Amino acid sequence: VGLGIFAYSGGPYPLSYHGLGDVAVLVFFGWVPVVTSFFILRGTIADPTLWQLATAIGLSSVNILVVNNYRDAEEDRKAGKRTLIVRMGRDFAPRFYLTCGLLSLGLLYPIYSFWGMLLMLPYIVLFSATHRHLQFAEGAELNKTLGKTARNVFFLALLIGAMLLLKG
């Protein structure tokens, strides 16, 4: 994860300045920690369920960056930071946020099916409310959206853990 932070903002080709920050978050906050933890515990990375879970967490984490880049779009543009939101326009952010959230949930459904997904209802309600807030918030109000999005990522991780325990 430390290497990811360096690659995101430093080095000869900072990913955040070239519209690749979202990919970096998916990799370094989804795939790397989840797959590494699984490998340490199980000694393999060949389980397709593992990659679905890692991608679901990663996409959920991307939404933190989406809100941050949405809030800072004008400053980023002036600084020459070509984030995905700067490249695609501010109207893209709420749609991308929704897409990441829906893909995250979609990756979980085949693993847990209907009954396991019932556990996700509170998350879906929180995610929907946060997405709605993102659509209408401006400036410093987006700091609240950022905090709610971080809460949602944490809550999703807890729910995935609960579903794993129930699945046995």
Q: What are these language model-derived features?
A:
Residues 33-54, 106-116, 161-168:
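Helix-coil boundary and interhelical linker segments in multi-pass alpha-helical membrane proteins
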Residues 1-45:
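Intramembrane alpha-helical segments
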Residues 58-102:
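Solvent-exposed interhelical
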Residues 23-27, 51-55, 94-98, 117-119:
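Hydrophobic alpha-helical transmembrane segments
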Residues 1-10, 99-141:
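Transmembrane helix-loop-helix
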Residues 20, 52, 99-102, 151, ...:
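Hydrophobic residues within alpha-helical transmembrane segments
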Residues 1-6, 46-67:
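Membrane-embedded alpha-helical segments that form the functional core of polytopic membrane enzymes
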Residues 23-38, 57, 86-90, 147-161:
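Small-residue-rich segments of transmembrane alpha-helices in multi-pass membrane proteins
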